[in-house]
Amino acid sequence: MDGIITLDYGSGGRKTSALIEEIIVPAFKNEALSAFSSDSFVVTPLEFPGGDIGKLAVCGTVNDLAMCGAKPEYLSFSLIIEEGLPTDTLRRVVTSAAAAAKAAGVQIVTGDTKVVERGRGDGLYINTAGIGRIKYPGLTPAAMRAGDA
């Protein structure tokens, strides 16, 4: 790792992995962290061909857990809603998220809702956290081999 944090450490790539593996995980020394993922979703537009922010949030967190060798089981689903968002849009996004959770076999068990002033939220932000049971320990980028796909 470099001696200073740069934007590269937030990209989700090798530097993010190094940051997590070299600083964060050793500090907590808790195996359960290997099957816990948290993410925030801030996309525009909220609805797009093939999906929406709700489906993206659920599928993104489920994928993050699966990529760590875990079977996703439970999610939190928190909303930051901008004042003025049409309720029909919110209903479609939440219904889509529920359908994605059902399709993935996960339960949404908790969440939070906040409303921010008009002009301060880009419509809707979603934060999720997921917990899964580790089925394939040691599934890491370092363990990948040619032909694993």
Predicted regions and their residues:
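Generic N-terminal amphipathic, Lys/Arg-enriched alpha-helix
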Residues: 1-8
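Glycine-rich phosphate/pyrophosphate-binding loop regions near the starts of catalytic domains
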Residues: 6, 14-149
